[in-house]
Amino acid sequence: FREKSILAGILVLCLIVLLPIGYRFIQNEKEAQQSMDEVLVNAFLDLDESITEDRAKVKALCTNYNSKEFRTLCMKLPQKYLYKTEIIEEIAAYDYSRYGDYDLPDLFSFFVGLEHKAQQNTLTQEDAENLLSLFDLWKSCNWNRVTAERFSQDPQIKEMIREMNSAIERYEMLEY
């Protein structure tokens, strides 16, 4: 009986020590996820701001196509969007099960493809229209209502990203 009492006492002491440690670990994990959600939301909102600006330019170019202006715009796309898409990619890689659906490598690759075509001077009005349709897809999401608290539960964002990636794949298949 005495050995069982000692064993029970040790077990209780272990629980007393481990429970606060476990609780703190869970709190740290929640805080880390909350911070990543906030960084991810800010990256998407920065991306939205840039896309809104570029969408207006591309829309004007689709109406009044100017190959020189479109070429200049396309030459700047990868550099302009690299940092924003890298942040999203890093967070998605950190916790793929939670953030993998938000990764945008296809969008960045599409921008690089447009830059490559601009360097070769082979851009067409169809490229401008494809870019505009991607930007329109992006704007179909109501970014004004996005917050860190609701971001990961918002199916509209994931669906919009899936649609964009599918559209990019279709455009790339047209190229080859």
PLM region spans:
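Hydrophobic membrane-insertion alpha-helices, especially the h-region
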Residues: I6-G22
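Alpha-helical segments in soluble extracytoplasmic regions
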Residues: E53-A118, N130-S166
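Immediate post-signal-peptide N-terminus of mature secreted/exported proteins
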Residues: R24-C74
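Amphipathic, heptad-repeat alpha-helices with coiled-coil/zipper character that mediate oligomerization
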Residues: N42-S50, S97-D103, T124
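Extended, compositionally biased alpha-helical segments that mediate assembly or anchoring
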Residues: A167-Y176
